[in-house]
């Protein structure tokens, strides 16, 4: 028993032990046709010992595609050296909860007093449930959709990029708020959702003065 004594002199050992296992599998397929049509497909599976066996694995796909219009034969706009349209969609999982065993009830050491003041109130070491578990806990999932365009002018000396994205995070892992009358720590739950949207713009210029090469850029989100 770790830290099982009622006072410091009775404790011969102190410490703790925790175990966590993670396993991941990942695969990717890329396709490139004549430098004009670009596709990529990814699939990953992650397993965490934080979850029960029926909730342990999460599968997260993603794919992206691009069309380099500037490589098409019909495209003949001399100042434009690069024009590419991009789109992507993908998912990722999160299992970082802070607790190593969130699906089971936690037990902690508590001292219990027996007797009265006349009996010197003998102090005994005991254990009691301190936190509720959640058997249905599963992976938090983030889904990102992105649409973008890349432009290059004058042999790509001047470049411009624009991206619009939507990021949805569902099943966010958080502790619930319980009334104090429950008397136990709140379990972790998949009960929150957040959506973020944004637009990223970037412009850059690169050149040289004799042997001096330089580049400048700016971005805004």
PLM regions with names:
Residues 1-221:
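Extracellular/periplasmic, surface-exposed regions of secreted and cell-surface proteins
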């Amino acid at each position: 028993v770790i830290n099982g004594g009622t006072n410091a002199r009775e404790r011969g050992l102190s410490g703790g032990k925790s175990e966590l296992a993670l396993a991941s599998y990942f695969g990717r397929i890329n396709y490139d046709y004549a430098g004009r049509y670009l596709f990529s497909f990814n699939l990953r599976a992650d397993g965490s010992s934080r979850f029960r066996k029926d909730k342990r694995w999460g599968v997260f796909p993603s794919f992206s595609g691009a069309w380099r219009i500037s490589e098409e034969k019909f495209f003949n706009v001399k100042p434009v050296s690069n024009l590419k349209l991009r789109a992507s969609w993908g998912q990722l999982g999160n299992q970082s909860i802070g607790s190593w065993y969130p699906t089971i009830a936690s037990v902690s050491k508590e001292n219990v007093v027996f007797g009265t003041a006349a009996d010197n109130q003998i102090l005994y070491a005991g254990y009691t449930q301190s936190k509720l578990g959640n058997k249905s806990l599963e992976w938090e999932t983030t889904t990102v959709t992105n649409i973008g365009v890349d432009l290059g002018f004058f042999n790509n000396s001047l470049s411009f990029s624009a991206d619009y994205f939507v990021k949805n995070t569902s099943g966010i892992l958080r502790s619930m708020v319980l009334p104090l009358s429950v008397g136990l720590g709140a379990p972790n739950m998949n009960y929150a959702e957040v959506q973020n949207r944004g637009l990223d713009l970037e412009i850059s210029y690169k050149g040289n003065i004799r042997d001096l090469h330089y580049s400048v850029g700016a971005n805004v989100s």
